[in-house]
Amino acid sequence: MYTNIKLYLAAILCSIFFFSCAEEKDESNKSVQERILEAYLDLNYPGNKYMKTASGLIILSHQEGKGLTPVDGDGAYIRYSVKTLDGNYEKTTLENLAQQLGVYSATEYYGPELAEIGYGKISRGMHEALCMMREGGKMTIIIPPHLSSFDYNKNYYYGYDIDDTPQSSVNKIYEIELVHTIGDVFKFQTDSLERFRDIHYPGVDSTVTGYYFKKLSGTYKDTIPQNETASVWYVGKLLDGYVFDTNIADTAKKYGIYDASSSYTALSVSYESTFELMSSEGSESGNGYVTGFARALKSMTYGDHAVTFFWSKYGYGADGNVGDNGGGVPGYSMLFFDIYLDEKQY
């Protein structure tokens, strides 16, 4: 079927080329994409078996959910996949689909992503679709190029430096599932951390809102003084168990994230008088650690083994820490660290 689609769309493109050479480039692309979309819909959804909104968003299917509909100011955890009109997938947050497509990578996170509603940080087409959905629902849409841009007025108002030019020059199909609607992101994270604590570390108190720490073994003597150095081993995870970083070679191999070009050696940490000065925000060099990790280190001494878990404010924040290859930590991720300190070397 995809072969027929490609041939049909190719024919449309050829005819458009001969009759629209005199048009401006942006007008030409808009016209081309409109005709390609029309051809695709005529072939695959004859008889207008789809819905077109006033903005031009195409809704191919909609399975209604039973939960809350997100509104501006909410957060929405979504799973989604993106593909071109000829059926080639370009991105997916679904692990099983990535495996089927042969593009799965253990270094890439597969799970729901948080979309912020009403801040101009998602495309106009995605915003419109999510605001028509309810929690638990699924929708397949086509976002044309003019709806792939961000709402500049909103992201400028909220202080985000986001380009409002279209993010795509072609029509894209989005398969979306609205997993969870969140009115208050940090209340949701607080509740999630408490549930995680109750399951894995019952009885551990939060020493400060959004932060938990438990020493599993070692001494309870004074912490390491300023200007001393400790050798640190760690495993960094999300709360669902996804390992995003470690300096332990065997652990990296176990979770499929081993990189032969990386050096799996102990992290040499120079201690300061406060954990704030050891964090990336407080260190003079700007090369410190995320706040939650720095706070945990400051609570440990030589030979200790401890765990800590905390909300995204003490981690990588709203932007996350995503690498060029797509791996890393998504925005608004709660983090968990398993930390070991070597004994002091004299």
Language-model features: where?
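Cross-family detector of peptidyl-prolyl cis-trans isomerase
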Residues: 21-346
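Sec-dependent bacterial lipoprotein signal peptides
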Residues: 1-20
